[in-house]
């Protein structure tokens, strides 16, 4: 699991600090952002595999942040973090490309489990891309080049 790097995005700094400490104890590499725009700026510099993203934030909310992440970094897996009142937003997030969602407050083991599943999904996709890119187009030995000058 030490390969996986998570970004937590939430405007509640106490939640970020507590969750970051709990994840660090489990050996997870974590960075934090307190807004969607801060998250996007950090993603420019950081190689993040999974983003755990709060739906309800002032300014750029979770849905707008999700759209921007998926547009710029389609391989990053995003897990929406939501309260009971914003389950509809989590469903909207799933429709827009989020991998999963978690209800607040969430159990740290459930959070880690969902992050590991998302990371595994990304690794499979990266492998498929690598295999596809390594294939070379082979021409049939029976293929005869056409003379286009007639």
Set out the residue ranges of the language-model regions.
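Receiver (REC) domain active-site loop signature in two-component systems and cognate sites
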Residues: 57
């Amino acid at each position: 699991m030490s390969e996986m790097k998570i970004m937590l995005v939430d405007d509640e700094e106490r939640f970020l600090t507590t969750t970051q400490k709990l994840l660090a104890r489990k050996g997870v590499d974590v960075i934090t952002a307190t807004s969607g725009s801060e998250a996007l700026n950090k993603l420019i510099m950081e190689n993040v595999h999974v983003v755990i993203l709060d739906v309800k934030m002032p300014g750029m909310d979770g849905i707008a942040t999700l759209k921007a992440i998926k547009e710029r970094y389609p391989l990053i897996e995003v897990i929406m973090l939501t309260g009971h009142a914003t389950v509809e937003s989590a469903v909207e997030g799933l429709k827009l490309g989020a991998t999963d969602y978690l209800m607040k407050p969430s159990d740290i083991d459930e959070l880690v489990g969902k992050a590991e599943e998302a990371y595994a999904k990304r690794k499979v996709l990266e492998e498929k891309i690598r295999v596809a890119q390594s294939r070379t187009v082979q021409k049939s030995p029976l293929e005869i080049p056409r003379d286009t000058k007639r």
